[in-house]
Amino acid sequence: MSPNMSLTASHPQQPQPTPQSKAQLTRQACNRCHASKLKCLRPPGVTTSKSCIRCIKADTECVYDPPQRFGRPRQKSRPQPESVPPRIEAREPEVTDPRRARHGSTIGARWESSERESNGSLAPSSAAESPYTAAESPDNRSSAAVAAAPLVGMDYASSHFPEPLESERTSELLDAFQSESMQLDVDSYWGETDPVMPPAATVPYSDLLTGPIDLDFTVSDQDDRAKIPKHALDPALSGADTGSTADDYVLDLVQLQASVNQNNRELAAMIRKAQSALGMSDGRVGQALPIPDSQFKTHLQRNLKASEQTLDVLHRINSQFAPVSRETRPPSRSYGLDPTLDRLYADCVSQDHAFGVGGDELGVRATTPPGVSAADPQHSILAFLVLTTYLRLLHNFDALISILQDRLRCSASLDPRRPLHLSEDISASDSSSNPLLDVSLGSFSFSSSSARSLQAMLNVQMINTVLTKIKSSTQRMLLGPDYLPPSSCSSSASTSSTASTTSCSTRAPPSSATGGAHHPATAGSIFFHHAHSHSHSSSDHLFSQPEGRGYAPYNHAFHPPPPSRHTHNYPTPETITPPSSVLGGVSGTTPPPFVSGVDHVVRRALTEVQELELSLRNRARAIQQWSEEGF
């Protein structure tokens, strides 16, 4: 008999642990053999010896201690259970569908019924050699049983799994999700049919995208323009140094828009929480929203960082898809693009621009870069992502500026010109309600509470700068590098073509509505179109915000604020009819449904962009006037 056989025979059998009594586990090797990492052998032919050979030779006690690590018990020497149905039956209540299990039916009963049904049409061996029989091995199944298995599974799936939800119930769930989520406001624009085509003589979107020529770069030479290196956007985004395609930019913008949307959700949650806390308080007149200064700074920095990344993407798009060279450059004024919508966005982001001279002549067309197709819907998505990202940034900055406006209004309660009966309940300056917004210029920072309005003004100027650059870069991407906005072509209206005159006069700058003079230096600013006009009329002191958006009208004079506050909910705009100058024509060709749908969404997004820019401009002018007057 070999030592291994004698070891197996002489090893004391451990009793099987039961739920009632669990035996203490011991090592199979004694302590001395375990410490020496040697095999623990019993004397051959002796079955009652509890000491191993080494302990007998050393004349020491053979001690077996419990194992220090309790692992999974070995299954080789233990007999397998004869059947497993009790374990399966114990788990059946957890997986039984309550809507399908009638009259006490279970999964096992359904399988038995399906097998009985299959036995009537299949070979007799298929029932005995079912793939779900535990006693049979998968290798021993016959071909008939293998062929029968899919039928059994299909029968089970058709009889057990629940049917899809009804269409009405699904619609209710989608509506509930849409109402609770803080997604893009243009999400509900999809599905609206029959967008009207723009006329051939109209510049697409020119009456909605009003603003300056791109301020990003100063181009001195055509050859240097093609040598602008592509730099990485962010470590989390595309970081390759090679030339990017439209797909790469779409991926960058999708990731960037997800970050901006997350900022929007957190900002909206912070405002709702502050409004709830303010509603539970005494509601004293002049009390600001209890938003900590640290949270405000965090959200401001996040959105400024997202704006920087947006500018980076637009810079790379405009640098890569810009025309490399042209024999002649057309005049810097409005021009007409191909109105066919399946070519619109491809023309905007590629080199294939058509410059209108005198309304009839066409300028020189540059060659389309490799890999750019005029009918590629990827360019429609690219334009859509750029505009909706800019729209969400407008939402976020509008909320941040409204917080600044709210704090300045509450700071006005400490002004000596304010009536005493309105400020008698106002305590001293509180850092939690009127904190100093630590704005620093190099090594200099403001430390006086009297400079609070100036600090807020610097924040507004910084937001204005980044949004203006994003808008001008977006115009450069959509309408070409030589696009001159209608607001800046009023001086040459007499010499421009009919189409140019129409596009220049379609939508006047907001300054004309209030009587302020149009200043050339501020024509490109989103916020301050007539910031240098100091003749404040009664209409300049009260800026009414667009109705239905939750904005409270604000009075520059020191009067008690209205009871309603900035809720910053983003309701979907009602049916917005775009200007007739854009949608007043019918094109001869019908665009693809996908591109036509994107065009309709973009038009509605542009209308909401214009509304938000007006709200931001009114708030910024209020803060600017406070900064100039002081308090």
Swiss-Prot record:
One of its GO terms (molecular function) is zinc ion binding. InterPro entries: Stress_Response_Reg (IPR051711), Zn2-C6_fun-type_DNA-bd_sf (IPR036864), Zn2Cys6_DnaBD (IPR001138). Residues 1-28, 64-141, 489-522, 536-573 are annotated as: Disordered. This is Acurin A biosynthesis cluster transcription regulator. Keywords: DNA-binding, Metal-binding, Nucleus, Transcription, Transcription regulation, Zinc. Residues 30-62 bind DNA. Disruption phenotype: Abolishes the production of acurin A. Gene3D superfamilies: Zn(2)-C6 fungal-type DNA-binding domain (4.10.240.10). GO terms for cellular component: nucleus. One of its GO terms (biological process) is positive regulation of transcription by RNA polymerase II. Residues 1-11, 119-128 have a biased composition (Polar residues). Transcription factor that positively regulates the expression of the cluster that mediates the biosynthesis of acurin A, a highly reduced polyketide coupled to a serine via a peptide bond. The keyword Isomerase does not apply. Residues 88-99 have a biased composition (Basic and acidic residues). The keyword Cell inner membrane does not apply. It is found in: Nucleus. PROSITE patterns: ZN2_CY6_FUNGAL_1, ZN2_CY6_FUNGAL_2.
